[in-house]
Amino acid sequence: SRRFGIDWMVTTDHGGPNHSKVHLNHAYPELLESREVVPEVIQFLGMEFDTPAADHTSLIFPQTDAEIQDLVQIEATFNRRESWPVDPLRNTPSQMLSALSAMKELSAPPLLIAHHPSRSATAYRKYGMTTPREMRSWNDLAPKIAIGMEGAPGHQAIAQSRARFEPSKLTQFLGESRPRGIYGSALGGYPTMGGFDQMTAVVGGFWDSMLGEGRRWWITANSDSHTHWSDGGADFWPGEYSKTYV
């Protein structure tokens, strides 16, 4: 991040069974160490939330003494993949609204931003896991928490991905297809529009409608950096390709 001129960033690990303990015992101590080593980059605690009844969302917590306790509380209680065996009651629209209500009660509430909102769409305006109705309901309940969505999703380096030490896992998963953002035909869905999600890209589309309703609804661009393209992944380093300006 420092190399590519980023002033701030947020770490957003995926959730999973009992992952709140991973955050508490492993990820957070490493974040504290990173803050000491690279103090010139503001580093927020967050996670890629397995959203009840929707696709992923980014949670970004303010830097406070209670930041890790707040994240663990929300993840352990509401992340749909936290429990094992899988609990279907954690994957409902009402569970997501309960999560937002709990976030509102925190002394320093997080921000929530919808990730790759149309990646599971099957066609233009044929939405998948995340829908306009859901995002409106989130913003209705918690307008200072649910504030936006990814306009330009990560995984934009997929076209230049190359295997460094072994056959790329992307090739195993996608074949020779290299859809930007891992949207599109390889997954049976609808591609990005020049690297932008359809909810953002279309004039008069979803983003414009949210703004036209008077909602304060922002878009972001992030790296979704799992594995760098030079190591066979689909990703740039944070700030290497796109940046979010605040």
Where are these regions (language model features)?
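Extended, charged catalytic domains and RNA/DNA-binding interfaces, predominantly
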Residues: 1-246
